[in-house]
A protein has these predicted regions:
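Positively charged n-region of N-terminal signal peptides that target proteins for export
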Residues: 1-4
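Heptad-repeat coiled-coil alpha-helices
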Residues: 47, 51-54, 58-61, 85, ...
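Short, low-complexity, disordered segments immediately C-terminal to signal peptides
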Residues: 18-34
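Short, charged/polar, low-complexity loop and linker segments
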Residues: 21-25, 54-65, 98-104
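Post-signal-peptide N-terminal segment of Sec-exported extracytoplasmic proteins
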Residues: 35-77, 126
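Long, amphipathic, charge-rich alpha-helical segments that form helical bundles/coiled-coils
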Residues: 68-113
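C-terminal motif of bacterial Sec signal peptides marking the signal peptidase cleavage site
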Residues: 13-16
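C-terminal amphipathic alpha-helix
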Residues: 34-42, 98, 102-136
Length: 136
């Protein structure tokens, strides 16, 4: 009877451990999916930034429009810097940390990269709108 209990305990422990590792892996995979999405948007960001930088070098016809272009350029720059900062600070190596610490860290990182994604989407959408209206 004792042997059965010991085997059952070991089995449950192994199942619990593998479940926590799966939770950690799933959360990390989720973070990396958002990161990959943000990186795909980087081309659009750089394209818009280049166009705005070129327009800003032209002689000013309308000061308000120049201010608007500069604000859009700064939003693009800020979202690019936010992504770079997140990438430099992100540490996927969580060896020797408890499951709770790993889940908290990954949860915080998921919120951070989602914030970067949102910031970048706003900057790209607003600059796309401005640039497409300017071409008309």
């Amino acid at each position: 009877m004792k042997k059965i209990l010991i085997v059952a305990f070991i089995g449950l422990t192994l199942i619990a451990c593998s479940d926590t590792k799966k939770q950690e892996k799933d959360l990390l995979d989720n973070i990396l999916k958002v990161h990959d999405k943000v990186m795909m948007n980087d081309d659009a960001l750089m394209k818009n930034k280049t166009q705005l930088d070129s327009l800003l070098k032209l002689p000013a016809k309308d000061t308000a429009e120049k201010v608007n272009m500069k604000a859009l350029d700064m939003k693009l720059l800020a979202s690019e810097e936010a992504m770079e900062n997140w990438m430099h600070k992100f540490e996927p190596d969580v060896a020797n940390k408890s499951h709770d610490d790993i889940m908290k860290y990954y949860g915080d990182q998921k919120k951070a990269i989602m914030s970067v994604d949102s910031q970048m989407n706003v900057a790209i959408t607003e600059s796309n709108k401005y640039l497409s209206n300017r071409k008309k």
